[in-house]
Structures are given as C-alpha cells and as structure tokens.
Curated annotation (Swiss-Prot):
<dbReference type="Pfam" id="PF00329">
    <property type="entry name" value="Complex1_30kDa"/>
</dbReference>
<dbReference type="InterPro" id="IPR037232">
    <property type="entry name" value="NADH_quin_OxRdtase_su_C/D-like"/>
</dbReference>
<dbReference type="GO" id="GO:0019684">
    <property type="term" value="P:photosynthesis, light reaction"/>
</dbReference>
<keyword id="KW-0793">Thylakoid</keyword>
<keyword id="KW-0521">NADP</keyword>
<comment type="function">
    <text>NDH shuttles electrons from NAD(P)H:plastoquinone, via FMN and iron-sulfur (Fe-S) centers, to quinones in the photosynthetic chain and possibly in a chloroplast respiratory chain. The immediate electron acceptor for the enzyme in this species is believed to be plastoquinone. Couples the redox reaction to proton translocation, and thus conserves the redox energy in a proton gradient.</text>
</comment>
<dbReference type="InterPro" id="IPR020396">
    <property type="entry name" value="NADH_UbQ_OxRdtase_CS"/>
</dbReference>
<keyword id="KW-0618">Plastoquinone</keyword>
<keyword id="KW-0472">Membrane</keyword>
<keyword id="KW-0934">Plastid</keyword>
<dbReference type="GO" id="GO:0009535">
    <property type="term" value="C:chloroplast thylakoid membrane"/>
</dbReference>
<dbReference type="InterPro" id="IPR010218">
    <property type="entry name" value="NADH_DH_suC"/>
</dbReference>
<dbReference type="GO" id="GO:0008137">
    <property type="term" value="F:NADH dehydrogenase (ubiquinone) activity"/>
</dbReference>
<comment type="similarity">
    <text>Belongs to the complex I 30 kDa subunit family.</text>
</comment>
<dbReference type="InterPro" id="IPR001268">
    <property type="entry name" value="NADH_UbQ_OxRdtase_30kDa_su"/>
</dbReference>
<keyword id="KW-0520">NAD</keyword>
<comment type="subunit">
    <text>NDH is composed of at least 16 different subunits, 5 of which are encoded in the nucleus.</text>
</comment>
Length: 158
C-alpha cells in the first residue's frame, strides 16, 4: 500500500521503497544511503521542516544497522500534522550514512548518540565524536554482537 508521500516521491522520480504504515498510521519509507541527503533536502523543501527524532538500531547480529528519522510537516495546522518515518539501512562492515545536520540542526546530538552506541558514521557531521561513552571506550555497546568487558576503569581527571 502506497501512502501520499510515497506517491509524491514516485511522481517526482525519487527512488525509495515503501515499508507500509506503522500502528499509528504513519507512513514508513526506506531510502538508500547514497540517496538520503538529496531526498532529505527535498523533504525539507516539501515542508517536512521538523525532525522530531532520530534513532538507530541493530537489525540483527551480523546484519544491517538502521538509522531512523521521524519527520513532521505542519501544513494544515498544528492539530493535523503529517508525519513520516524514514529508515536508512547501512552494512555493518561500512556503516556510512550522510548526516542531515545541515538540513535539520536538531540531528546534531541524535546522530552523535547513534554513532556512539552503534558506530554509524554520519558523513559531513560537524563534530562526530562520542557523546555518552568515554573517548577511550572500545566498541559499540548497542550492537547485538557487542561483548561487554568484564571490567572497565575510568580514570579520575583530578
């Protein structure tokens, strides 16, 4: 089943895959990493100027990593927002996705957290470094194949 945004993207020749609707009726689309930045700019111009949230998850041990964007478009008033969920999948061996910081500034800390927890590299992010874990931390704690260390010592800065 194709939603309104999916039909609009097809009409304008933009490559994507419709993943249907979630339990709240929000349209979900899959965009390839190489197409994501240009599609993000087009969505912003089309009216999706609010990035409500960005998160990431590990699809399966040894499988793909996903970066998820929840966008909102308010065209007919705040009581009738149009929402869409965009999923961008990247291979675990080279998890690179273009950063949308330059489109939606609110992606800054959210993309940094996804990098810190899952190791997804967001190309052209202005300050992609760890935000929750110490810089010396080894590995990506939310990956399903992550092996937690038995002991980790945090040295006091004093």
């Amino acid at each position: 089943m194709q939603g309104r945004l999916s039909a609009w993207l097809v009409k304008h020749g933009l490559v994507h895959r419709s993943l249907g609707f979630d339990y709240q009726g929000i349209e979900t689309l899959q965009i390839k990493p190489e197409d994501w930045h240009s599609v993000a700019v087009i969505l912003y111009i089309y009216g999706y100027n609010y990035l409500r949230s960005q998160c990431a998850y590990d699809v399966a041990p040894g499988g793909l990593l996903a970066s998820v964007y929840h966008l909102t478009r308010i065209e007919y008033g705040v009581d009738q927002p149009e929402e869409v969920c965009i999923k961008v999948f990247a291979p675990r061996s080279n998890p690179k996705i273009p950063s949308v910081f330059w489109v939606w500034k609110s992606a800054n800390f959210q993309e940094r957290e996804s990098y810190d927890m899952l190791g997804i590299l967001y190309d052209n992010h202005p300050r992609l470094k760890r935000i929750l874990m110490p810089e010396s931390w080894i590995g990506w704690p939310l990956r399903k194949d992550y092996i937690a260390p038995n002991f980790y010592e945090i040295q006091d800065a004093y």
